[in-house]
Every structure is written in structure tokens, then in C-alpha cells.
């Protein structure tokens, strides 16, 4: 994944890959509003900060922002774009949020990120990491595409998964790579992976018009389940 997102950061069209900075505040406010929340203060972990298009606005809301990304080149851009003194930029591995400590986040934000992860195992590992870094009373705000029910969407997912590595071997562009195109969970798989991560849904919404083929655009507010015993 690091190679793919370093390549995106090196492009003169980086906004094409990570989103338009001019709409970042509106998207952020809309995400919180559609989930009936307006979090402020405390520590926010921004998962997949990219070149920092939302980071500065998060710094206005929260006392501290840990903006994490898998790409060193994206973090270089983010540091040059965001001057807020309450932001720490953190390089993380592709499958987790190390070196962040347990229970450190009052809020976890993951927006336009899970859609790019190339397999269910990586999505599930990120959900577990959200639970790990969340404080006991913390909330995670997550956006992701969820496959619509039916045989045709399932068939499309299988065919797409088989074709993407072949296409990436012929075409070298960022958008052809599995690490950009991502994987689509079914609703049942998402429920299973949330349960395994000990995360519960406290608010949910969907876009009226999804930008994803054969998938709903889903927005979730998540909280940690209490530890047993």
C-alpha cells in the first residue's frame, strides 16, 4: 500500500486520489451531522490523513490531532499544508495504527479510507485497531462502501478481485492498483468484523445516491463494547 500512496502523493493531481480540499470542511461537518454528533475537544486520531485536506479543520475542533498515514510522501505534503501546532503526523504500517497507544483517542475519524483497502482482512484489522486506540467513552466516525445484497453484486466482486491484479500488471497507474480500487464488504461481513472488534453501531446513515458501483455508501458512529467481566 505504501508504494501506491507514495505514487499518488508524487502526482501533480493528488486531489484526484484523496479528495478536493475545497470541500473538506463541508464534508467533515456533514459526516458528523448525519450521525447526530458534533465532537469537539480531546484527542482525535485521523486515519489516512493524506495530504492534510481535513487535518487543519480537525485541529480547530480538537485539542490534539494525531494524523496518521501509510505514505511518507503524503505526510510530507500534509506537514507543508497544515501549520496547526496541535497536530502530530504519524507514519503507520499498512495493517494497523502502531505506534499509537491503547485508549488514546476520544474520536477516531476514518473517511474515504476503508474503501481503498484491498482485502477483508485489512478492513477487519483496521476496525480492531480503532477499538484498541479508542478511549472507553470514545467514538469512531467511519465511512465505507458496503456491497448491496444479491448474486450479481457478489459475482461482480469476485470477478473484480480476480481482474484487478492482472490489470495492475499491465497498467501502472495508481487507479488500476488493488490498493487503490479496494474491496467491498457485504453487510453480513461488516457486522461480523465489527463484532469481532468489539465495536457497536450507535448511529448509521447512508447516502441517497451512492458513488460506488453495487455498493451503498455507509456512515457509522461506533463505540467500544465494555470489556467482559
Question: Model segments located where?
Answer:
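Conserved beta-strand signature within the Rossmann-like core of class I S-adenosyl-L-methionine
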Residues: 137-144
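Class I SAM-dependent methyltransferase SAM/SAH-binding core
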Residues: 51-96
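Conserved class I S-adenosyl-L-methionine
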Residues: 1-39, 41-50
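A short SAM/SAH-binding and catalytic strip from SAM-dependent methyltransferases
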Residues: 107-121
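C-terminal alpha-helical "lid/dimerization" subdomain adjacent to the S-adenosyl-L-methionine
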Residues: 147-193, 204-205
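A short glycine-rich, Lys/Arg-flanked "PGG" loop and its adjoining helix->strand segment in the class I
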Residues: 124-136
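A short acidic, Gly/Pro-enriched loop at the edge of an enzyme's catalytic core
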Residues: 98-108
